């Protein structure tokens, strides 16, 4: 233990902050300094496909239906917010009801993204449909388009949003919770290093009130 390797895949929102802090904390634990990590990013669909082909040992992603080979363990909650440019008519609001935004051009996540199904479900819950003008896979790319007034969007509330000139609006309706999951193959051998890392992930998220 302490000298193995972990192949880790994760969705884009976790790249700037969560994964670096997590891994740094793990390798600085006594006995873990020689553990080697390989990293990859992608959409939930692509990550789970690569998990099943054993490119990855562990994936952090949204949950997916009909994946009987995969065990999903919730590790953290991620708030979804509406973002608009600073001059947008919605920018004066303190929160947004999704039933009231269908008239505005909407920048959506692509269909391969796990978050797309969640956002579609939120609109369905208020009997509404967004006016989708384009699809983008990555959060920062969406924020950049919103900043230049190409459209509005719904994204996870991540630290990187502060680097864009956008207004962040909480969603008042519908009520929602979005979770990030740790995904592993049910019937695959798990090395001592992998088991140790999984346990650390659970403790890290609990300690940081993410779970």
PLM region descriptions:
Residues 67-79, 140-187:
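Beta-alpha-beta core module
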Residues 43-48, 52-55, 61-62, 112-169:
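Hydrophobic hinge/microswitch elements
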Residues 5-9, 59, 83, 107, ...:
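Short, well-ordered beta-strand segments
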Residues 18, 168-211:
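A late-sequence structural motif
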Residues 105-126, 190-198, 205-211:
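Secondary-structure junction motif
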Residues 3-67, 135-136:
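Central regulatory/effector-binding core of bacterial HTH transcription factors
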Residues 7-9, 80, 96-115, 205:
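Short loop->beta-strand "edge-of-pocket" segments that line small-molecule binding or catalytic clefts
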Residues 67-106, 191-192:
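Flexible hinge/capping segments at coil-to-helix
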